Amino acid sequence: LIVVPCVSPWGYETINRWDPLAIDPNRSFYPDSPAPESKLLMDFIGAMQQEFLLHIDLHETTDTDNSEFRPALAARDAIEQKAWEIPDGFYLVADAKAPHLPLQQAIINEVKKVTHIAPTDENGLIIGAEVPSEGVICYDKRKLFLCGGFNNATYCSTTEVYPDSPTATPEICNRAQVAAVEGALQHLLK
């Protein structure tokens, strides 16, 4: 069991998706990454020369994703950024290439004991993505250079808690993350 407590400490402390170099570490998991945080984690894991059964990536999304990050990204890169409603609640991002929905549902079922699951929007989507199972969306993690795609773990999930929810507290968000890990491990031990 390997636990990496915080891949992007500066981003966490400043409630910011970027690192001090204005790079999004979570979308920088590729060889020769310009994000030192991503490169260090890949080097650390790569040096182990291990196959991994599970990769679970614990995230939180705050309102600053739309109020600060997306406008700054649009200004910097001159690319229109579509803002979407940040879901009020917990949800998961599975790997589109291998979603393993029973694992995702086991995580959701455990988290439901602690906090609410993000509902879909009026189009039946969460952040613009289809929802194949309650509280679950899928991204191609390798193609997007996401943390969950760099190590070829058999099972993969990324959690998203929403600390800006009027019904959430830091304690609830932390308990939801613990419940997610517990749900994943319990599922694998069955």
Language-model regions, residue ranges each:
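Structured catalytic-domain cores with a bias toward divalent-metal coordination
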Residues: 1-190
